[in-house]
Regions:
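Active-site-adjacent structural elements that line small-molecule/cofactor binding pockets in enzymes
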Residues: 1-292
Length: 292
């Protein structure tokens, strides 16, 4: 479930996460933007309007700090980013932050990453918008190098180091799992080369069978070319918040081969209708589809 409600209220976030966990949801996902813009020229790729559905004054805490709060409030539910704008972060520091989170959560972290779509945000950070894909690839390689046991070395276009040690290491074998987001050939190839999961997203029209059939071969062929098992790359897709629509969409996602379906939360408060809405969602969607 995507976490987008009342994110500035730590008590709500903790209680909401505990409720979602108790109902058997598999994972909670945080979102990421360093800043939002009241006006922008960049085009949001997942709506025909080109506008993001998030209001510019939305409360959007840092996703890693938010996951630390979630890790302390829960015991079993998986925690991830959907999506962390990877090239906007420093990969050496991020590797340490994620390894620490994985330790403190006892191995429950998944890092979902994308290259970002808001050019204005990238320029605010004094970064190059045009090379964000190349930087994303290198940032992944840097983090994986630092998560290896022992002494690390890396030689790339942006980072070079040798004889360094970054501890603690992630709890999970092979490092924090990577979920690669995007809807392009480049994103699909990135998932095949580096990803544990691929998360194409078409919120304008829901899961797109034709687009997925076009993209998925890039995942599997790239994985095979890199000496990886193509079947080891999992597929995550998106549904909606309405229970009836979500069940139909989730069933369609499963037919497409999805290993996970991320849903949007129903609206409401913990003191009002939200607990009942989530419980209804569990009975009408999770249980019929094989959830707890």
């Amino acid at each position: 479930m995507l976490l987008i409600l009342n994110l500035a209220d730590p008590d709500f976030v903790a209680r909401y996460a505990q409720l979602v966990e108790s109902l058997g949801f598999e994972s909670l996902w945080t979102i990421d933007h360093a800043v939002m813009h009241a006006t922008y020229d960049s085009r949001y790729p997942y709506k025909t309007t080109g506008r993001t559905p998030l209001p510019p004054d939305s409360n959007m805490p840092d996703p890693l700090i938010l996951m630390a709060l979630l890790a302390g409030a829960t015991e079993r539910i998986r925690l991830g980013t959907s999506m962390l704008i990877l090239p906007q972060r420093h990969p050496i520091i991020l590797a340490k932050e994620l390894a620490t989170l994985d330790q403190y959560s006892k191995g429950r972290i998944t890092l979902g990453v994308g290259v970002g779509w808001v050019k204005e945000e990238v320029l605010d950070l004094k970064q190059n918008f045009g090379d964000r894909g190349r930087r994303t690839n290198e940032w992944i390689e840097v983090m994986k190098a630092l998560w290896d046991e022992g002494v690390s070395a890396y030689q790339g276009d942006y980072f070079q180091f040798e004889g360094v040690i970054s501890n603690p290491k992630p709890v999970q074998e092979g490092g924090v799992p990577l979920m690669i987001g995007g809807h392009s050939e480049a994103a699909a190839k990135r998932a095949g080369r580096y990803g544990d999961e691929f998360y194409p997203h078409w919120s304008t029209r829901g899961p797109d069978k034709e687009a997925l059939e076009t993209l998925w071969p890039f995942v599997t062929e790239t994985a095979a070319a890199c000496g990886r098992d193509p079947d080891a790359v999992k597929l995550t897709l998106t549904s909606t918040s309405d229970a009836k629509t979500s069940r139909e969409t989730a069933e369609f996602c499963r037919e497409l081969g999805a290993d996970r379906v991320v849903v949007l939360p129903p609206k409401g408060t913990l003191e009002g209708s939200l607990p009942d809405e989530l419980a209804r969602f569990r009975e009408e969607v999770l249980v019929p589809l094989g959830g707890e």
